[in-house]
């Protein structure tokens, strides 16, 4: 049976950067294979985690003698990105390729998620940085983009924990937030996923999360734990569906979560104005554009 109109098949993947490969090219091909396999299995969009590409670090070190963030960024730009653009050109398919250090024209380094859709490329930089990311500079733009009839945004790890950022998306009709993440503790996994669920309620949208797992020869991502997760709005239009789908939490290897999105429940929810729904308050009623003082009693 043909799926209903305006559906989207998601493949959420954790990723273990400790790949047994011999070169930067082999590492890139392994990532390409994971994405193409997801597409071949029916996914319209594949989501990989934050710092997927920091597993390049030991290969960059052997090749150029050092592996600073800038070195990794240059290796990705010169060796990985051209190969990715050559191979990932499939129409009607999209992927968020995790994140990688990326050089700015001014010489800074940003934590960047590359996105491919229908063979075209765009990116999202991380906007809020952890204490461990002192070598990066924060991004300054949150991009909205569309694919398959759905409006999307990529919000990276700590950014999902900042409700002030989700405030910027009120009244935007965002349908899906994609959150690549990396954390070394179970508490970090819980924090990211609980906030992802909250963003789903606040904005009335779907939120998908993919965490990094495993070990890597890297000071930045030496140990990782995580899972794949998906959250829906807690509204009547979604009552026949689970509000959360989560894989098991793992410390290594790849876990998989396949999810089908349908546009109809989102559209129905947005028409149900008599239902209590924080997503329908808009910026003015939510107290963003009107002054609500805080008083101490």
Describe each PLM feature range.
Residues 1-10, 144-153, 176:
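Beta-strand-turn-beta hairpins that frame and shape the catalytic cleft
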Residues 103-172, 185-195, 251-268:
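Active-site catalytic loop in hydrolytic enzyme cores
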């Amino acid at each position: 049976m043909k799926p209903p109109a305006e559906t989207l098949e998601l493949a959420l993947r954790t990723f273990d950067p400790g790949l047994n490969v011999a070169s930067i090219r082999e590492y890139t091909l392994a990532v390409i294979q994971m994405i193409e396999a997801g597409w071949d299995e029916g996914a319209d969009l594949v989501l990989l985690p934050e710092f997927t590409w920091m597993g390049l670090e030991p290969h960059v070190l052997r090749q150029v003698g050092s592996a600073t963030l800038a070195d990794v960024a240059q290796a990705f730009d010169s060796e990985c990105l051209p190969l990715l653009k050559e191979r990932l050109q499939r129409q009607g398919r999209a992927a968020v390729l995790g994140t990688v250090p990326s050089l700015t024209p001014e010489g800074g380094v940003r934590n960047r998620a590359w996105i491919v859709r229908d063979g075209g490329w765009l990116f999202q930089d991380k906007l809020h940085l952890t204490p461990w990311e002192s070598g990066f500079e924060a991004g300054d733009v949150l991009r909205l983009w569309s694919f398959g009839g759905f409006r999307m945004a990529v919000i990276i790890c700590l950014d999902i924990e900042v409700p002030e950022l989700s405030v910027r998306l009120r009244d935007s009709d965002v349908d899906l937030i994609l959150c690549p993440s990396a954390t070394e503790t179970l508490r970090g996994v819980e924090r990211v996923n609980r906030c992802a669920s909250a963003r789903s309620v606040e904005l009335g949208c779907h939120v998908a999360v993919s965490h990094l797992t495993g070990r890597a020869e890297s000071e930045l991502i030496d140990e990782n734990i995580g899972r794949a997760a998906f959250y829906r709005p807690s509204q009547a239009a979604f009552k026949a569906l689970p509000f959360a789908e989560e894989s098991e939490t793992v410390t290594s290897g790849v876990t998989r979560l396949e999810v089908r999105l349908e546009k109809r429940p989102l559209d129905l929810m947005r028409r149900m104005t008599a239902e209590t729904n924080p997503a329908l308050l808009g910026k003015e009623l939510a107290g963003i554009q009107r002054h609500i003082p805080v008083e101490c009693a």
